[in-house]
Amino acid sequence: MNPSPTTVLFLSTGDAARGILAEALLRHKGGERFTAYSAGYCMLQEIAPQALALLNKDGVDTSGLYPKGWKDFFESPRSILVDVIVTLSEEARAHCPQWPGDPVRVHWPVDDPLAATDADERESKFLKCYDIMQNRVDALIKQRAPHSPAELMLQLRSIASVV
């Protein structure tokens, strides 16, 4: 019998770029070992078109992706218990509430590509963000299944430096 998948929630500021990229990539590459979600503390109304374009270019399924607020995960009838919370922005890290089930928390900082002021800079930042997310998701998938929450925390912290 296969163990239940590790449920990972990626938290960012608006859930329109970084979190969406991480969620989609882990869903695409993680197989049955992982269940991925993303949310923002200050949810935006739509996914950044650059994020969707990068995912689509690589054949990553984007159906069902949309910006979500993190309160949807623990203040609603459909609340989901998560095993791991990965904050992707300083804002998400600072505002992250206490989570039901006491999940492992780790911070994987990534610059916000939506903060870029012109089109060329934005494209460059999106490409860099996408590459970092791909590399970190790949590193996560390559980890062997941890034997304890402490071991999981060490694995996740080591991935934070992957660029």
Please report, for each region that a protein language model flagged, where it lies by residue.
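Short polar/charged helix/loop
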Residues: 1-163
